[in-house]
Curated annotation (Swiss-Prot):
GO terms for cellular component: HslUV protease complex; proteasome core complex. Na(+) binds at G167, C170, T173. Keywords: Allosteric enzyme, Cytoplasm, Hydrolase, Metal-binding, Protease, Sodium, Threonine protease. This is ATP-dependent protease subunit HslV. It comes from Sinorhizobium fredii (strain NBRC 101917 / NGR234). It is found in: Cytoplasm. Protease subunit of a proteasome-like degradation complex believed to be a general protein degrading machinery. Belongs to the peptidase T1B family. HslV subfamily. SUPFAM superfamilies: N-terminal nucleophile aminohydrolases (Ntn hydrolases). The keyword Amino-acid biosynthesis does not apply. NCBIfam families: ATP_dep_HslV, PRK05456.1. It catalyses: ATP-dependent cleavage of peptide bonds with broad specificity. Its main location: cytoplasm.
Amino acid sequence: MSEHNPYGTMHATTIITVRKGGKVVMAGDGQVSLGQTVMKGNARKVRRLSKGDVIAGFAGATADAFTLLERLEAKLEQYPDQLMRAAVELAKDWRTNKYLRNLEAMMLVADKSVTLAITGNGDVLEPEHGTIAIGSGGNYAFAAARALMDSDKSAEEIARRALQIAGDICVYTNHNVVMETLDAD
């Protein structure tokens, strides 16, 4: 247990993005845990931004993630159709702003052209193998998706199976999958 939170650490989620076959899919599970207790099983941690042209998913503290989603939405309004630029500007603010620096979350964002992971360290990472995952079960989902990328499975099937595998292994990930899909370049 932390000195700030008598209930322990909040653990939340697995988010994965798969880009394959002219589609980009982002999927996340619905579990939010506080310490050893499942607080909610149907949280929605994947959503559309920027008039539906961008999909975003978050892992970490929920209030912090919503703050970052609002900031990203503002950056997308400032830099329309420039997800990379908006993400870099958000990462710069996140790293240098005294208030934002303390936010504990990670984000995956994608549009028709690019998929990015954004961290509080100022990192904006673009995956090289068509998939990336974050959160407590992120490594399990990522490994599963990488193993399936050469199969004949669709992006949707890969994302769903990867989350299923992560949910089987990670106690902070469940099988309640929310998925958003965009047509990709």
